[in-house]
UniProtKB/Swiss-Prot annotation:
PANTHER family: PHENYLALANINE--TRNA LIGASE BETA SUBUNIT, PHENYLALANYL-TRNA SYNTHETASE BETA CHAIN AND LEUCINE-RICH REPEAT-CONTAINING PROTEIN 47
Protein name, as recorded: Phenylalanine--tRNA ligase beta subunit
Bound cofactor: record note: Binds 2 magnesium ions per tetramer.
GO terms for cellular component: phenylalanine-tRNA ligase complex
B5 domain span: 402-477
Location (main, coarse): cytoplasm
Domain FDX-ACB: 708-801
PROSITE patterns named in the record: B5, FDX_ACB, TRBD
Entry-linked InterPro entries: aa-tRNA-synth_II/BPL/LPL (IPR045864), B3/B4_tRNA-bd (IPR005146), DNA-bd_dom_put_sf (IPR009061), Fdx_antiC-bd (IPR005121), Fdx_antiC-bd_sf (IPR036690), NA-bd_OB-fold (IPR012340), Phe-tRNA-ligase_IIc_bsu (IPR045060), Phe-tRNA-ligase_IIc_bsu_bact (IPR004532)
Organism listed in the record: Pelagibacter ubique (strain HTCC1062)
Record: residues binding Mg(2+): 455, 461, 464-465
SMART domains recorded: B3_4 (SM00873), B5 (SM00874), FDX-ACB (SM00896)
Taxonomic lineage from the root: Bacteria, Pseudomonadati, Pseudomonadota, Alphaproteobacteria, Candidatus Pelagibacterales
Protein family per UniProt: Belongs to the phenylalanyl-tRNA synthetase beta subunit family. Type 1 subfamily.
Length: 802
């Protein structure tokens, strides 16, 4: 945003000089990027007339021009512009002048053998517009008698270039900047009252906003001014327009541009006599075209906001007008538009069509929706003052009402955030100067937010405004505490890191995948919960939050199988999502293994990974984490995505409080659906949220190995019991007879058949007895044998096989 100090003082009564104003702007967050001096730099650019234009003797695209620069003087200039011709009025820069755009200093030079004294300038080179296809063409009726005069007014002024952040659209007008400076104590904001208009008649041009889906225009104000004389702008207006790098065109156009930069209120002017019947604000239809004021034809997409009449599109709402109803010097009747357009719609349409205008820049950031009347008042007054004419009543069409937002602000929050305090009365004064409407109610401030501040919506925004105006230098510099506090982790975090190491130590590779997954695969691993769909997924195959990590791991395992790898072990610890409510997100350690078990010795036989291997991995990890193996309870229930006969679940005790793990073969039906060709695929899930604090600290996992100097003994037992009896209970019963002596209980045979009653089975177990204090005698061993038999028969109903 560019401003001049003189223009700023139209709104701000201040005693500060320019340098002090620049410093204050930066202090309040309106960073000054640079100051361009216009005093003297443009004095040498004069109005000139081409007397003769001949083809260059050695270059087809160059012309040698004789140029009249006033006072009977003419100079030779070599020019490459295609529009350089005899009789053209343009702008000449002599040797020594500095071109505004490139900052290049001109010198006398030879171009293909012909000496050129200076340069004929395009509008782009003079920063008047983006037009660079040819040299500037000046109107003969306006400039014919001014040959030799300076084109730019001789004013001693500097242009201050301010960097406006995207949230501060209100400062894209001079008044918004003045308001901030006044609030910061740089002066007093001048109350500008418009002259009361003598509105003769009603506005006779019908305007209608189509209330349709995605309508970007919520309000459209218009004012008809009849009998105007669209003339050249007065010097004061031209000075302001030129200072900001704009080209004066005509009084009506210059007035609309001036109000946009002055009040941040974009306007548009229509030649009423070129409008076909009525104006309709509607959504465009795909394929509609119109010629814009930049002389380009645009082809529109669906649902772009357009201003139209019976003959078609007149302009793209809030972005650019069309040539068909543009005002000319002979315009007699003009309709002024002051409307509000949705920032999102403006941003979308301008991006598709690749259009960038000053109006678009403001609308896409959000202008004041309640400034429609203000814009019409200022425009009607200036047009009537400069161009004459009769002003109609204002016509305001709306499809919804805009109300100011409000919030409650607790002043104590300011000190909590900033570290320093200001008096509540000073807070009220600052906010009042910024345009807030404040009422104090029992120490709380009820604040109505200014309509031009869409960026303010919560208390912290108010804190930011207060500290910005009061000054960031008020915040005291406090050295950070150098005492480093001991970092503490909760149980789940400790388990997370411990299980990472524990599972990896068993030959698993850790994978890190998205928390998103493909709904088609996720459905295979859902039990009773519902999927959580992602509204705007980063990919079509990552469209839901995963219910199980299996849905990610199984895909990556299959990719590795496809690359020729067979024996694979992956795990991941991360979140799963069973619902959208609090507590329905779980942290789960999940693993998959496929192929054959790695042999520990060449003497061992190769075999496929099975359910017992993955069960062992889970139990070992839990034991290493500090949970008592003897307290773990296992049964054969598991979710439907496990093989029903080769799976199970683990509880921390027999009371079955919460499942801490599932394990087993992955269901063959899932492998078939996913076309996974593998001989064996087993998996596990450990639920960290269901694990209670272990009695043994996670720090105390490495315990001293207790070895014995005494010989161990082995005893084999065979028990006959019910066919459906779970072996785990039998093993636990034997282990609990004497935990110090009994080191191992393993099943080595299961028999059904001759000599075994129907409905029964024989289970043979090997028991290792390891004394720590003395060698056991035969009597000692017989006592232990009898204790084992008695315990099994009394607790399980089994009988020793004879």
């Amino acid at each position: 945003m560019k401003i001049t100090t003189a223009w700023l003082k139209d709104h701000l009564d201040t005693k500060l000089n320019e340098n002090q104003i620049i410093d204050k702007l930066t202090d309040i967050g309106l960073e000054v990027e640079g100051v361009d001096s216009q005093s003297g730099e443009l004095d040498q650019f004069v109005i000139a007339k081409i007397l003769k234009a001949e083809k260059h003797p050695d270059a087809d695209r160059l012309r040698v021009c004789d140029v009249d620069i006033g006072s009977g003087k003419s100079v030779k200039v070599v020019c490459g512009a295609p529009n350089a011709k005899e009789g053209l009025l343009t702008i000449y820069a002599p040797p020594g002048a500095v071109v505004p755009k490139s900052q290049m200093k001109l010198v006398v030079s030879k171009i293909r053998g012909v000496t050129s004294y200076g340069m004929l300038c395009s509008e782009s080179e003079l920063n008047l517009s983006n037009e660079s296809d040819g040299i500037t063409e000046l109107l003969p009726e306006k400039y014919n008698k001014k040959v030799g005069e300076n084109y730019f007014p001789k004013k001693n002024l500097n242009v201050i270039d301010i960097s406006i952040t995207p949230n501060r659209a209100d400062c894209l007008g001079v008044r918004g900047i003045a308001r901030d400076l006044a609030a910061a104590g740089a002066g007093r904001l001048i109350n500008q009252k418009e002259k009361k208009l003598d509105k003769k008649n009603k506005q006779t041009i019908s305007v209608k906003i189509e209330n349709e889906k995605n309508q970007a225009c919520i309000s459209f104000g218009s004012c008809l001014i009849k009998g105007v004389k669209n003339t050249e702008s007065p010097e004061w207006l031209k000075d302001k327009i030129i200072a900001l790098g704009q080209k004066p065109i005509s009084a009506i156009v210059d007035i609309t541009n001036y109000i946009m930069f002055d009040l941040n209120r974009p306007l548009h002017a229509y030649d009423v006599d070129k409008i076909d019947k009525a104006i309709v604000v509607r959504n465009s239809k795909k394929g509609e075209t119109f010629e814009a004021l930049d002389n380009k034809e645009y082809k529109l997409e669906d649902e772009m906001c357009v201003i139209s009449d019976a003959s078609g599109v007149l302009g793209l709402g809030g972005i650019i007008g069309g040539t068909r109803t543009g005002t000319e010097l002979d315009t007699k009747n003009v309709l002024i538009e002051s409307a509000y357009f949705s920032p999102r719609s403006i941003r979308k349409s301008s991006k598709i069509l690749n259009i960038d205008t000053d109006a678009k820049f403001r609308f896409e950031r959000g202008i004041d929706p309640l400034s429609i009347d203000q814009g019409l008042e200022r425009a009607a007054n200036l047009i009537q003052e400069i161009c004459g004419g009769e002003v109609s009543e204002f016509d305001i069409q709306k499809i919804e009402d805009v109300k100011k937002k409000s919030l409650k602000f607790d002043p104590s929050l300011f000190e909590k955030i900033t570290g320093f305090n200001i008096d509540i009365k000073e807070m009220i004064k600052i906010l009042d100067n910024l345009g807030f409407e404040i009422k104090e109610n029992k120490g709380i401030l009820d604040a109505v937010i200014p309509s031009w501040r869409p960026d303010i919506s919560q208390e912290v925004d108010v804190v930011e405004e207060l500290v910005r105006i009061k000054g960031y230098d008020q915040i005291k510099i406090i050295e950070p505490e150098k005492v480093r506090k001991k970092q503490t982790l909760n149980l789940k975090q400790k388990l997370f890191h411990f299980l990472q190491r524990s599972i990896a130590s068993k030959g698993y590779f850790e994978a890190i995948t998205w928390s998103f997954t493909d709904s088609k695969i996720n459905q295979l691993f859902i039990e009773n919960n519902k999927e959580i769909k992602i509204i705007n997924p980063i990919s079509s195959d990552l469209n839901v939050l995963r219910s199980s990590i299996f849905s990610n791991l199984i895909i990556h395992l299959n990719k590795n199988l496809g690359r020729g790898f067979k024996d694979l072990s992956f795990f991941e610890i991360g979140p799963t999502f069973l619902g959208s409510e609090p507590g329905e997100q779980q942290t789960v350690a999940t693993g998959l293994r496929s192929g054959k078990l790695a042999r520990q010795s060449w003497l061992e036989k190769e075999r496929l990974i099975d359910v017992f291997d993955v069960k062992s991995d889970v139990i070992k990890s839990l034991v290493e984490a500090g949970y008592n193996k003897d307290k773990l309870y296992i049964d054969d229930e598991a979710p439907s995505y496990y093989h029903p006969g080769k799976s199970g679940r683990i509880f921390l005790n027999k009371g079955k409080e919460k499942v801490v793990a599932f394990f087993g073969d992955i269901h063959p039906g899932i492998l078939k659906k996913l076309d996974i060709k593998v001989e064996s695929l087993v998996g596990f899930e450990i639920f960290l949220d269901n694990l209670k604090q272990p009695k043994k600290s996670l720090k105390d996992q490495k315990t001293q190995y207790k070895y014995s100097d005494f010989q161990k003994s082995e005893r084999d037992f065979a028990f006959v019991l019910d066919k459906n009896f779970k072996v785990q209970e039998l093993i636990e019963t034997i282990s609990n007879v004497d935990k110090e002596l009994i080191k191992s209980v393993k099943v080595f045979d299961v028999y059904e058949g001759a000599n075994i009653p129907e409905g029964k089975k024989s289970i043979a177990l090997n028991v290792i007895i390891q004394p720590l204090e003395k060698t056991l005698t035969e009597d000692d061993l017989n006592k232990i044998n009898q204790l084992i038999i008695s315990a099994v028969e009394s607790k399980t109903g089994a009988k020793i096989r004879s």
